[in-house]
Regions:
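N-terminal Rossmann-like NAD(P) cofactor-binding subdomain of oxidoreductases
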Residues: 1-191, 227, 260, 291-292, ...
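Charged docking surfaces used in two-component/phosphorelay signaling
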Residues: 67, 157-337
Length: 337
């Protein structure tokens, strides 16, 4: 099996290399693609050095079986036909195709079978905040249908890419050395010692595109009529996102019911002993595959409401790992060989 990574030099592209090696993904060959800026860079995978090729409209994907793409929506839109025309399955990490009716949007723990119906040869990887939330909420939805969700996200700098992480570190350095921040390029404001209540562009209804994604993607993945109201916030941590989630179910659920369902849910680790200061934190979830969940409690304002706190590594489960799990499912069921 031949695998391609498009956007190999980025934060998610590099995570693809680590995860494919860690999980011993069944592949015989690897090819890396990137922009003019990245072409020529070399990376080691399983002891062998690979050079990044310039992504072009040619026959480079002729023998590729699976292509993981994480180079932005514009690149995905431009090169989708080039990538898939010889039969490669394109698993795309951008937002470009997520709401297209003929492109499945997949979280393997929830709707893996949707990946088998892909008329364009494309499978969309959901937004990181959506993935983390639905992995936790789907087992609860099986207990009683979730009608409404309110969520506030606390999203680290790495959600905006490797350059954004570097900018945050540079801002802290400038504050120590001069007392002022000079470098503000990847964020609309200084992020160091700050939080920014905007991720992505504002829409006409004053929700950001990130927040609208959570509404639409949750419905598509869970095959649900659930309504989600989100506030997405950038915080000055480097890696791992967190979310405070309130949800209303059709019937009241006890904390014990929820906790027991989550303990056996795939991709979830319950960390919930708040009386002893035990709860999920981004420092602890960074570098791990599971979504950590805790602070599970009844909502004081709604008898059918509960609330919880979750955190997870958005570069792993929120991006690269989820895509690799999709590919593993396709191989497992014999859809890709």
């Amino acid at each position: 099996m031949k695998v391609a990574i498009v956007g190999a030099s980025g934060a998610v592209g590099q995570e693809f290399l680590r995860i494919l090696a860690e999980r011993k993904f069944p592949m015989d060959d690897l090819v890396l693609f990137g922009s003019e800026r990245s072409a020529g860079k070399k990376y080691t995978f399983k002891g062998k050095e690979y050079e990044v090729k310039l992504l072009q409209h040619n026959d480079d994907f002729k023998d590729v079986d699976i292509a993981f793409t994480s180079a932005g929506g514009g690149t995905s839109a431009e090169f989708a036909e080039t990538i898939t025309k010889y039969g490669a399955v394109m698993i795309d990490n951008s937002s470009q195709f997520r709401q297209d009716n003929d492109v499945p949007l997949v979280v393997p723990e929830i709707n893996a079978e949707d990946a088998l119906n892909r008329p364009r040869g494309i499978i969309a990887n959901p937004n990181c905040t959506t993935i983390m939330m639905v992995v936790v909420l789907n087992p609860i939805d099986k207990l009683s249908h979730i009608k409404k969700i309110h969520v506030s996200s606390y999203q680290s700098a790495s959600g905006a890419g490797a350059a954004a992480m570097a900018e945050l570190q540079q801002q802290y350095k400038e504050l120590v050395e001069t007392g002022k921040v000079k470098t503000i390029e990847k964020f609309p404001h200084q992020l160091a010692y700050n939080v920014i209540p905007q991720i992505d562009k504002m829409t006409e209804n004053d929700y950001t595109k990130e927040e609208i994604k959570m509404f639409n993607e949750t419905r598509k993945i869970m095959h649900s009529d659930v309504r989600t109201s989100a506030t997405c916030v950038r915080v000055s941590s480097l890696r791992s996102h967190s979310e405070a989630v309130w949800f209303e179910t059709e019937r009241p659920l006890s904390v014990e019911e929820i906790r027991e369902a989550l303990k056996v849910a795939p991709g979830v680790t319950v960390v919930d002993d708040p009386q002893n200061y035990v709860y999920p934190m981004p420092l602890e979830s960074a570098g791990h595959d599971d979504i950590y969940v805790g602070r599970i409690r009844k909502d004081l304002a709604d008898d059918n409401g509960n609330t919880l706190w979750l955190t997870g590594d958005q570069i792993r489960k929120g991006a690269a790992l989820n895509a690799v799990q999709i590919a593993e499912y396709l191989i497992k069921v014999g859809d890709v060989k």
